[in-house]
Amino acid sequence: MVLDPSRYQDHRTWKMTPGLIRARQPFFKKNMIGLAILAGVSAGIYTYTYSFLHKDNDFADVPIPPIDEKELEKLKKEYEQHKQERQ
């Protein structure tokens, strides 16, 4: 059977027996330190990558052309119409 009962688990509740808990105690602190290091390295890499990617500003030197007042009003009307259609 796939889930054969282990002698280190209670057969009714599947909880660890006191013997298994005692056997795992010496490794708990080292495992938590390893987990903290692994999580710290992962968070550091993620933070570095996120901050590096947000520094990118490729289009800073491209000038934005001025917009005509009539065209601006037309765009505002289109935006309002689109906003009302979504609701």
Curated annotation (Swiss-Prot):
GO biological process: mitochondrial cytochrome c oxidase assembly
A Pfam family recorded for this sequence: Coa3_cc
Similarity-based family: Belongs to the COA3 family.
GO cellular component: mitochondrial inner membrane
Protein name: Cytochrome c oxidase assembly factor 3, mitochondrial
Primary gene name: COA3
Function as written in the Swiss-Prot or TrEMBL entry: Required for assembly of cytochrome c oxidase (complex IV).
Mitochondrial intermembrane topological domain: 54-87
Protein's cellular compartments: Mitochondrion inner membrane
Membrane topology term: Single-pass membrane protein
Transmembrane segments: 31-53
Principal location listed in the UniProt entry: mitochondrion
Record topological domains on the Mitochondrial matrix side: 1-30
UniProt source species: Zygosaccharomyces rouxii (strain ATCC 2623 / CBS 732 / NBRC 1130 / NCYC 568 / NRRL Y-229)
Quaternary assembly: Component of 250-400 kDa complexes called cytochrome oxidase assembly intermediates or COA complexes.
UniProt keyword terms in alphabetical order: Membrane, Mitochondrion, Mitochondrion inner membrane, Transmembrane, Transmembrane helix
